[in-house]
A protein has these predicted regions:
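Peri-membrane helix termini and adjoining interfacial loops of integral membrane proteins
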Residues: 1-5, 77-82, 254-263, 332-339
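N-terminal signal-anchor module of multipass membrane proteins
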Residues: 1-42, 369, 385-387, 394, ...
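Loop-to-helix transition at the N-terminal end of transmembrane alpha-helices
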Residues: 14-25, 48-60
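Transmembrane-helix bundle segments that line or gate the permeation/cavity pathway
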Residues: 26-44, 54-86, 92-142, 156-159, ...
Length: 429
């Protein structure tokens, strides 16, 4: 039969929508935030101490919502647990269910151990409903000893060490699923798991910078300049590696010039020209690269460094989302017969629309806000010299005290004793 009698493309549409884009995006934030926490707990990067707790709780909050996009995508979400009850030994999705459960349990235990001193202290000091909540979280513990703290520190480090490969597998398997689809040339590459993993670290570090700077701004405190600069340095290195791997993959496809390159080049230059060329490459990769080069300069003004790092992190988060979109949705836009393209427009409503996606992205932030109300998300800082401090029953400001010391130091001894002598020699009334 003549091929001209067919209408191409003959594909009904795409199967994986924006929810499948959100799923690797959220799991990437989970893995990247945990890596930052592990840099402090395992590799003793003391410069990351201000964000160590925030990174761990952020990973837990986003991990608790990571499966929501998959449940919204399923037509029968009530059957989701079947993958755990009757697993298939050769299914990567079944393996993910067990890895996700193990990682979630590890996060819960590690967060509890990190905050256990605070939980026990508040269980003893708080009353009412708040005290009941902390006593439940304390699991019967009413005091902390030096020995128990040492055991907790050892367990935290052990869990952080075990969590690094689990977090990498948790997100790397998503790239493994796409790379294993041999029928799609846009997905079938051995670099796909590595690209997904490195981009996860990029998004996690960028997300932590945005959260830390935003929370400091909301509380009216200055971000730790050394901590922000260190995270910007890690982000710059991870961004260079991620973009280099993506460009190597694309360059290899172009140099090989297989039968599929014609449709892939049309896909990139026409259908993904904005999301790939403009957003992912120019806005999300080139601009953050230049901004981070400015932010990592050692003698840069802290406010300018924080502004450059925060703006670069926001652009990187957009870049990673665009990368997920271009991989998941872009790989479904061309016909399986390489003859024509499929159009896809994201609806506003429905369980796989823009509003539902915005709600899914908001839920982890809401969980993080609740966690901030319940537990201290970063290390206690030293009292600032500009803040008033308490002496006895009076609140005194450091400025009058400093002025008094200055006057005392500059006034000659004879003049300092003159008012006292005048008071003693004055006649009593």
């Amino acid at each position: 039969m003549d091929a001209n009698s067919f209408v191409f493309p003959n594909d009904p549409g795409i199967a994986w929508s924006i929810m499948i884009v959100l799923y690797p995006y959220i799991t990437g934030l989970v893995a990247g935030a945990f890596v930052v926490s592990a840099l402090y707990h395992v590799f003793h990067q003391e410069v990351l101490k201000p964000v160590a707790k925030l990174a761990l709780v952020t990973s837990l909050c986003f991990c608790s919502c990571a499966t929501l996009p998959l449940l919204l995508h399923l037509h029968h979400p009530e059957r989701a647990l079947n993958i755990m009850v009757t697993p298939n030994g050769t299914s990567a999705m079944a393996g993910f269910g067990f890895i996700y459960s193990l990682y979630m349990l590890l996060l819960v235990v590690e967060v509890w151990l990190v905050f256990r001193p605070t939980i026990v202290e508040r269980a003893n000091s708080r009353i009412g409903a708040a005290g009941l909540v902390y006593r439940i979280l304390a699991l019967g513990a009413r005091k902390m000893t030096d020995g128990s703290r040492q055991v907790d520190d050892w367990a935290i480090r052990l869990l952080a060490m075990a969590g690094i490969p689990i977090a990498c597998i948790l997100h790397g398997y998503v790239g493994f699923l796409f790379g294993a689809i041999k029928a799609n040339p846009w997905w079938s590459t051995a670099l796909m798991p590595v690209i997904f993993l490195i981009s996860a670290i990029v998004s996690g570090i960028a997300g932590l910078i945005v959260l830390y700077v935003g929370m400091c701004w909301r509380r009216g405190v200055k971000p730790d300049a050394d901590c922000v600069r260190a995270m910007c340095r890690y982000l710059w290195v991870a961004l260079v590696v991620a973009v280099s791997l993506e460009m190597l993959e694309l360059g290899h496809m172009a140099y090989e010039s297989g039968a599929e390159w014609k449709v892939l080049s049309t896909l990139l230059t026409e259908h993904l020209a904005v999301s790939y060329g403009l957003i992912q490459v120019v806005i999300g990769s080139l601009c953050p690269f230049l901004l981070l080069l400015i932010a990592v300069r050692p003698r840069l003004n802290p406010r300018l460094m924080t502004a450059c790092g925060g703006l670069a992190s926001l652009l990187v988060l957009v870049q990673v989302f665009a990368m997920r979109w271009n991989v998941v949705v872009g790989g479904q836009l061309f016909s399986k017969s390489y003859r024509g393209f499929v159009e896809y427009t994201v609806p506003w409503g429905g369980r796989e629309g823009i509003i539902a996606a915005a709600i899914v992205l908001t839920l982890p932030l809401l969980a993080l806000w609740l966690a901030d109300k319940l537990l201290p998300l970063w290390q206690d800082s030293e009292p600032s010299a500009s803040l008033p401090f308490e002496t006895g029953s009076r609140i005194m400001s450091p400025e009058p005290i400093g002025a008094a010391f200055a006057i005392t130091a500059e006034t000659p001894p004879a003049e300092r004793t003159q008012p006292v002598q005048a008071q003693l020699t004055s006649p009593a009334k």
